[in-house]
Amino acid sequence: MIIEPLSLTSARWRELEQVYGSAEDIGALLAALYANENDDERTELWYGVWATLCPDGRVFSAAYAAVPHVMEIAANRDFAERVAALHFVTQVEVSRHQSGAPGIDEDLLLAYASAVESLPARVAELHGITWDEQTAQVLGAAVLAGKRQHALARLLLQHGVGE
């Protein structure tokens, strides 16, 4: 069964929240990430995703709709971008269990859950590449988040590398 994420052009984005209020522009931000091939511009777009949807460990409802897209966007990208995307999804999953985080609306739940549950498989795709400590920290947390061990994933993300 194929689970479709929220369409990037759906009016539903207006009903979701990001750090600055309505998430009506998030579909366009994600569409730009799908389409843009310029590395510098992609870096700015990724910054926009983090800054609007999961800044400082806080999560907003539009992040739940964005997560399946983020996984799809990064699927065929280079190693660093794939790790960054897995980090974002892991942070969203960890943050949604914090006090005050918004719940996941029913219409977003299946696509979101499917994306989160795919984290361990996405990490396994990167097994043949050498990981530095920070990458191992992020990818270890991603496996834990995908296995619904959000408290352990949070601890791993919060633990300083080299401590």
Per-segment meaning from a language model:
Residues M1-R12, E17, E93-E163:
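Long, helix-rich interaction regions
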Residues E4-L6, N38-W50:
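HEAT-repeat alpha-solenoid elements in large eukaryotic scaffold proteins
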Residues A23-A32, A65-I73, S118-R122:
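Alpha-helical solenoid scaffolds in eukaryotic proteins
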Residues E37-N38, R77-F79, W131-E133:
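Short inter-helical turns and helix N-cap capping residues of alpha-solenoid HEAT/ARM repeat scaffolds
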Residues E44-V49, A85, T135-G140:
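Conserved hydrophobic register position within alpha-solenoid helical repeats
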Residues V49-L53, F88-R96:
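Hydrophobic residues within the alpha-helices of tandem HEAT/HEAT-like
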Residues A66-V67, N76-T90:
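Helix-rich alpha-solenoid scaffolding regions
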